[in-house]
Amino acid sequence: MKSLRLKFSTAYALWVAVLAPPCILLFLKTRYVWAGPALVAVAVLLALITFRGRRLLGWVAAFFAWLVRRRRPLLAPSEPVVGATVQPGDHVAVRWKGKVLVAVIELIARPFTPTVIVDGKAHTDDVVDTRLLEQLLSVHCPDLEADVVSAGHRVARTAAADVVDLYEQAIGADPAPAHRRTWIIVRADPRRARKSAGRRDAGVAGLVRYLVASTTRIADELSRHGVDAVCGRSFDDFDRATDIGFEREKWSTIKGRNSFTTAYTAPGGPDVWWSAPADHTITRVRVAPGVAPESTVLLTTPDKPKKRRGFARVAGGQRAALQAQILVSDRHHQLPIGSAGVLVGETASHYPVYLPFDDVDTSVNLGDARVFTQFVLRAAAAGGTVTLGPHFRPFAELVGAHIGPEAKVAWPNATSYLGRHPGVDRVTLRHNMVSTPRHRQLPILPVSPPGEGRYEQALPGAGRTAS
């Protein structure tokens, strides 16, 4: 019964007040005198009671709207146009998304930032505070709004199935995505921003100049507050990260090419959103001056979605949620920016520790055979493409790694070399500590699930290095 709510609306109250007297008078001189008050009572209940946020008429309207559009393809955004501010080199791509003009800011992850999971909550200093974003909008462009969009995955399906299953068991329900990127989409509604845009130029040209200048200023202010933000010259990376392979909208899910993507409302925040098992996760938090933030979550799974605790599907509005037209009221959050990374150990209090490797090139010095085995297994499950030397062929076949002249893990935007490599930062992993350019020595305890032992036995007897 938690889905049932009472919701008062002035418009509905006026309609009931207007129609109630005729209903009562209609049956007054019949033997069904009770029918008039009964109809009024039913109308009052229908006007007050909502189910999952909609009244009965709202559900009927949503159903017929879904019938009309369910087989239509998605409307593609317009081709991006790059506009420049008065400062040469500050280029910002803008495009139309429906009736709204949008620009993109990419938030750059802070390298070598560990994430510690304490009682199901992720602790990291690589975050963007939605309160700060609302403050910047209020000061510099109060008639604009911004969406903080994160996309990524907890584990990847590119490695051997046994390796992925083993890593999923090791991380459990930790809100620790192996890969995640974050953008801010600045949105300009021509109706709301008409006055500010008109000061710069007439029509669309003024709106473009206003959006470009505002986006540049927000990125600069975020950087001054310790959040590395870069204006996007294109939407290519964002589009690739948020593509779900849309084919057809169903009532409570979206059919993709080889998967199902479901839009949910889940007010629990990023710790809840990123703990849900899924092949791909997209989160969106909308921030606007003077109003509470709004959010929605999209989870992609290979099979039809099942009921999730704490998540409510957006019934009859999956396409609208995908296109950022349906969001639910939320609260301010500190949103993680980059990847949590790979599980490297735990603290003395047995809290898991994760370290990202997918944001900057590194040379990884692995302490012994067990650490080497664990890192290769977990990096493969996290989405890295592992390459090992020829004498590691039995181990590579077991893991699903490639054979090549140089041992490394290739991530989408970085490479981790398993050994010395000139010109890149060095990370040292031992069973009892982690050393990075940012942290000299972080003491840790090893996490060794039972299933990892059989992989270590496949290592060659001579030599314990990766090359």
PLM-predicted stretches and their roles:
Residues 1-79, 427-467:
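N-terminal alpha-helical membrane-insertion module
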Residues 3, 112-116, 362:
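Short small-residue beta-strand/loop micro-motif enriched in glycine and branched aliphatics
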Residues 46-141, 339, 343:
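N-terminal topogenic membrane-targeting module
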Residues 111, 152-154, 188-192:
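Short loop/turn segments at secondary-structure transitions that flank enzyme active sites
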Residues 131, 135-144, 379-382, 465-466:
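A short, charged
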Residues 141-183:
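Structural flexibility/helix-modulation signal
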Residues 168-467:
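Membrane-proximal, solvent-exposed terminal domains/tails of membrane-associated proteins
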